Amino acid sequence: MKPTIISKLESLKERHEELEALLGEASVISDQDKFRAYSKEYAQLEDVVKCFARWNQLNSNMEEAQLLLDDPSMKEMAQEEIEACKTEIEQVEQQLQILLLPKDPNDEYNCYLEIRAGTGGDEAGIFAGDLFRMYSRYAESKRWKVEVLSANESEQGGYKEIIVKVNGEGVYGQLKFESGGHRVQRVPKTESQGRIHTSACTVAVMPELPESELPEINPSDLRIDTYRSSGAGGQHVNTTDSAVRITHIPTGIVVECQDERSQHKNKAKAMSVLASRIVQAEKERQEQAQADTRRNLLGSGDRSDKIRTYNYPQGRVTDHRINLTVYRLDEVMNGKIDELIQPIITEYQADQLAALSEQA
């Protein structure tokens, strides 16, 4: 391992020890903000420090084994020990490289998840509902909380558009690769001839940024409309104009929120989504301007950016970014999507490592 990397790891180890001492001090324990910040930093360093300790232990074991090579009775055992250490050291060094990769500061945040029906009419709306259930079940398995902000239901079931907020630890980091076009191939329930139809939905994932990171929005740049919430009917349908639609005139971004019965609450939620969308749009514009030949596994949420196909007749799901196919469609639609998400994260980390190697 390079001396610069070892030096970096030593400084992280020292910081971890320093934080451990600080967390035991009365002045820190009594200051909740400071205690929370130090605890978070301590937890973030935990994995890399443990991994580095293992690396040091393996190198120490290998040095001890090398001292035994001159002893004929111990030579064979020492050689086996050295080979085993070399193999594990290689694995641990790969882990350390990944742990030292630059972190996306947004990864720890909650996120907004938007699902929109695209081409395919009613069937696209039904598929949007299927995707919403898939993500809801996945969130449930992770003990995350899903909060519906706005839902525009389609006539045959499902949604023309649904926007939700997902709350939990590391939510954006796990879901950010879901942005892009999702295509379904299946026989619709309304199809009498048994023909397979292709429909599509778009998914967009954005971090919920803290207030300090949100852009200042000029009130004169906004058009705010209020209207009555739409719903299936019955006693819970609003009779007041509590639903809110906000248009950001300079960018043309439109956000609707109708989940709360209070117009003020709906407006606050819509403003939060709008701010995140403005930040995301600017980020995508900058990334596009800086784009080089390296592929970008982070989808844009654009309809043309097809990332995944769900083929019902064959029971398969294919991720087109890394040519990954799994034949467990039922499990996937029931929320077991880690086997699709984790390979993308691994591939993304490999791309980051390759980029760092090129810069070195």
UniProtKB/Swiss-Prot annotation:
Q: Which interval of the chain is the signal sequence?
A: none
Going by the UniProt record, its keywords in alphabetical order are: Cytoplasm, Methylation, Protein biosynthesis
Subcellular localization, as worded in the UniProt entry: Cytoplasm
Q: Signal among the record's keywords?
A: no
Q: Any idea which residues bear N5-methylglutamine here?
A: Q235
Q: In what ranges is there compositional bias, type Basic and acidic residues?
A: 284-295
InterPro entries assigned to the protein according to its UniProt record, in alphabetical order: PCRF, Pep_chain_release_fac_I, Pep_chain_release_fac_I_sf, Prokaryotic/Mito_RF, RF-1
In what way is this protein post-translationally modified? Methylated by PrmC. Methylation increases the termination efficiency of RF1.
Q: Annotated region Disordered: where?
A: 284-309
Top-rank taxon, per record: Bacteria
Any one GO molecular-function label of the UniProt entry: translation release factor activity, codon specific
> GO CC annotation: what is one?
cytoplasm
HAMAP family reported for this sequence: Rel_fac_1
Known role = Peptide chain release factor 1 directs the termination of translation in response to the peptide chain termination codons UAG and UAA.
Q: Which family does it belong to?
A: Belongs to the prokaryotic/mitochondrial release factor family.
Identify the PANTHER family for this entry.
Answer: LD18447P
Question: What is the protein name for this chain?
Answer: Peptide chain release factor 1
Q: Tell me the name of the encoding gene.
A: prfA
